[in-house]
Structure formats: structure tokens, C-alpha cells
Amino acid sequence: NAINMSCLIRREQITKQLKQLKRKQRTVVGTPDRINDHLIRKSLKLDRAKFIVLDETDRMLDMGFGIQIDRILKYIPKERQTLMFSATLPEQIVKLSKKYLTNPERVSIGKTNVVAQNINNEIIKIKKEDKYKLLLEQLDNREGTILIFVKTKHGTVKMAKNLSHDHFASEPLNGNLRQNKRDTVMRKFREKKFRIMVATDIAARGLDVPHIEHVINYDLPQLAEDYIHRLGRTGRANSIGSAVTFVSSKELGKWNEIQIMLDPSLKKSNSKNSFSKS
């Protein structure tokens, strides 16, 4: 049977959505900003809602939707079932779950600590001040589409600007982009209008562009699990992918965390070594 559903997103005309809501749909799917618009207009009522699903919660928080989510949840009865999906569990997610979930059960699905065998993975230990020079060399020596990961939203803009100045056409992808701008950037990237994208972890979540041939980890991720997500952006559909990771001296601690995630036995050997030295 078909599911009666309203889709509430900012890039669509609100008049079309108002018509949908008048049909009293059982299911509402939408972005936090537009759902709030309808709650304020009173065109959407959630006082009888029994289920709420927060999908890609970490990405929504990274895009600044935390306050919007708070407002929405105030309209929903406390007696409800809440499902929260997130690829990572940063501190913000933990706080949100404690605030809104009652006796929650955590479910982890699939192995997250395995690098696909069809991805050629290279690690380069380097001084922080030499990273950009090495990046330019890597871009010169690599053909095809490239996805570069940096730590911050501001960093994506700065990096894309610097690369374009150095004759490497590139665009930033981060949580601050409006949906229409993100759609434009993604369309051009898929159409190979430019070959280099600079992204944050959250903004690139779920990115499925088959022709990405190389991933460059300019900065290490804040969460070890994101290392696997990054490498998964290349080598799609069993094609051969390539990844290179820059590791500066200040990032060695974080790199050790990533190695232990990939091979938990390293944790035991490290603890034995530290015990014998003490």
C-alpha cells in the first residue's frame, strides 16, 4: 500500500506543502527549518505524533540545526518513540540523546573498521608547514577527480580559494552551504565541471560520486571512525581507488587512535610495551 506522506523542505514552494498538509498525511518527512516554519504557521500539528526519526543527526547538528530540533521536539508529546541515526557519536550527539531519549538502546550495524581492499592507501608523515607544498605535488601527479578532507568549514573555503589561486579549480563543501548552493556544487562535481572538492567529514557523509578516484586526508579526522568513511568515498562499485593521508607530528596521537581502530590488537601490544617501560 502507498504511504501518505508530506515532504517539507526549504527549496520547495510552501503553497504546495500547505496543500499536502491539508490532506492530513500520516507521515511527514522534512528538514528542521521548514518543519519549524509550518509549526509557527500552525499548518502542521504534532501533538498526536507517536514516532520521531532523526536521520543523520550528526550532520544536522553540524549544519546548525540543533536549535531547530530542540524547538520541534517541544511540539511533540513526551510519550513517543524516538529513533536517532548517526554515523558517528560526537559529544553533541551524546548530549542530545541524554536530553531526549529515555532508557535508549544503542544498536551498531556492520563493521566500521575495515578499509576496502580495492583502495590503495598511502601514509605520509610530514611537517605541518610542508603539507600544502606536498598537496600541490600530489595534485600535479594525480589524474581524475579528487576529494580533499580538512578539519573545519572555514578550512574548506580557504583551501579551495588557495588551490584555485594556484590554478587547481576547486570548490568547498561544508555544512554552512545553503541547500541550493550545495546542490549546484554537487551537480557541477558530478558533471566534472571541476575535479577537486574540499570537504569536511559531515558535509561529505553519504557522498556517492562514482568517478572520485582519489581521497586526500590533508587533516586527520576528529573521530577515528571518520577515517573509514573518508576512504569509502573512493573505490565505489568495486573500482580501484586511491587514498593518501598526511600525518604531522602533532597528529601522531590521533593517528595512533586510527591504527588501533583498524587493528585492535595494537592496543594490547601498546599497553604491554608501556607496562614494561614503567
Where are these regions (language model features)?
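Conserved helicase RecA-like core
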Residues: 1-278
